[in-house]
Amino acid sequence: MLLFTKLAAPKAPKRRSRAGCTSCKERKKKCNEERPQCSRCAERGSSCVYEPVRPRQRRKRDSFITSLADASTNGSHQHEAEEDDHGARFDRFDACEDHLSQHQRVSHDWGHQPWQASMPDSFDDDLIFSPLDDTFDPNVLLAAAPLETSSVIINPDEDFTGPLSSTTQPRVLRYEEDDDDGEEEIDIGGGGAGLIGIKHDRRSSFTSTTTVATNTTAGNTIFSTDLTICSPATVRSPLLEFTCPSFSEFSENPRQRSLVDHFCNVLSHLIVFREETGNPFQQLVLPLMRGGGGGGNNSPVADAVFALAGAHLEHRGVDVKGGEKSLYFHHRAIQGLAGLIRMHNAGVNRNEVLAAIMLLIYYEVLVQRGRSNIVEGHLKGALTVMCSNPEPLDSTGIFLERAFRFYDVIAALSFGTAPLSTAPAAGCLVPFPISAPTATSTLNNVDSLLGMATTLWPIIHRLSALLPLKTDVANARDAGHNGKVAVLRTEFETTVGAVEAALLGWTPNLPTGWVLHESDPTKLVEDTTAAKDENSTGEEKRSGGDSARLHSILNNALAYRNSALVYLYRTVLSHPRDHPLVQRHANLSLRHCAATVEHQGPMGALLWPLFVAACEAVTGADRDTARTAFAAIDKRQGMTNIERAWDIVQEVWRRAEGGTEETVRGEGVRSDTSPAQLSMACSRELKGTADMWRVVSKEMGVNIVFG
């Protein structure tokens, strides 16, 4: 409890030492004042001379200052009280008075009269603004006072290309001061700063001038305002008083901001391969959260982001209290998406619709609720939007279309149906991002969603259409349409041969200076036989930090290649589990999956090749490899489909060991039968081939999308 008040004694103003040696003063360096020789002079081997310290000189106050102080007694008393509390203001007040008196003697004869209550203020009330007002313009404050030219040195090599705005980069001031009373030099640095230095009186360094650089339509202009002349001070921005919460531009709700934070800092990194130029979900999808929501409602993209992030947290057992569950945001996203589709012809952003659909597909893949065809319905909706409005694609459109193609093929392989889109021509897919590749990066050939499998994806797209084509052959055979059977069978056999040859001949596009190891296909080594110039050598040295990520991305692509061959031989051509081709490529695929996990690289697209190869694993070593890989990706990704896929794999192993697996083979067909003969025999016996894992999945009542 405060019993009495007492004015604190004024603090002694801090003074700079002026007793340094002459050598340090000339160089404008700080002197430690050691005798007989300071450390700087001792280091340079120069003579160290100390001069007597001269007393400080103060300018005499003119009668104007005296009359001004007498006329404003109340203001003086208030200033003296502040001076008692803050002694550091003493010098600033003296400097202000000295500058005013000097300005009166040299420049003007103003003839000021003592202030009286009847006299109007020199500044109109209209010049006092609030930065929260819509009409607030900082340029009015700058133009309110007379301008005074400062001694400014302009670098001719620098230019001022931007207007004075909130995005202007701040200047970093570096003071280099002399120990004597006199001038001090301020170096203004920073990117693109055109000011080299400003020289002014040291005693008025805090109050005399403020220099601002701006660009007008007539040309570049540098001006300074004298704060002792323009008396009211500029109003500080309220944003300087507090820190805005992260992601406050997307939502005012703390719970929703935490979901955006989880999406940006966790989820977006789990589903891409390449982030050296930025995460595409953060750069391209996140800005779409601001659109589409009218009347205070969130946009469908925002609700889909909230649903996806919330479902991922809920699956990991994280209960973020104080907000709605992911299912609530999912329903809102569905309703908002339906409204956007109804208004699609009214100028609604096409990318916003596609982004909402793709995020909802990610949500459905994550939660995996029973045997539903919601993913297929979303994919059909996305295809309808893309076909109904074939606009020129920007970066966001290209990225969303790439994500659609990925899930279209993965869903076709998962459900055994034909893909909705047409297969892209060979060589038409280029790695995303397309623009501005980094010259020294080893990941220039890596796609953000497909990794190194960009050139492999058209082949896998054609592979996914083979099982439905085989089913069509069987249906035509049962219906007795012999002509149709002949046409479809020819198409099937031709496509099978082309896909098999393409898969066996495919090789990843490796970065410069790297080749596959001859004995271990999971490793990359430096190409020592090829001639290297200085630039390629530098690239190899700089790529050492990305070596682990590069190995992981490479093994992911090779796992897709070998699992595609397993799918071709086992599912499409109905080879038995113990067939040499099936076991060879299943073993290679599991080795590549293990190498992907070992290098701790991206694992977002590893589930399908790992699942296909693990279902055909026979030996204990292969099953241990599959078990380790499943545990690693489940720990990293935290998705429901990974857990359910692992449950199905274990059930397939149990049935295979118990001899209860339903093997589909034609009568009199040997294991070395050609693919064409085997496909004909299978088409006569059954309407397609049912994999054991599909039977198990149906019995468990789930549909798994291996994305």
Curated annotation (Swiss-Prot):
The gene is ARA1. Transcriptional activator of the arabinanolytic system. Involved in the regulation of extracellular arabinanolytic genes and in the regulation of the intracellular activities of L-arabinose catabolic genes in the pentose catabolic pathway (PCP) in response to the presence of L-arabinose. It is found in: Nucleus. One of its GO terms (biological process) is positive regulation of transcription by RNA polymerase II. InterPro entries: Fun_TF, Zn2-C6_fun-type_DNA-bd_sf, Zn2Cys6_DnaBD. PANTHER family: TRANSCRIPTIONAL ACTIVATOR PROTEIN UGA3, ZN(II)2CYS6 TRANSCRIPTION FACTOR (EUROFUNG). This is L-arabinose-responsive transcription regulator ARA1. Disruption phenotype: Shows no growth on L-arabinose and strong grwoth reduction on arabinan and arabinogalactan. The keyword Nucleus applies. One of its GO terms (molecular function) is transcription cis-regulatory region binding. Residues 21-48 bind DNA. The keyword Nucleus applies.
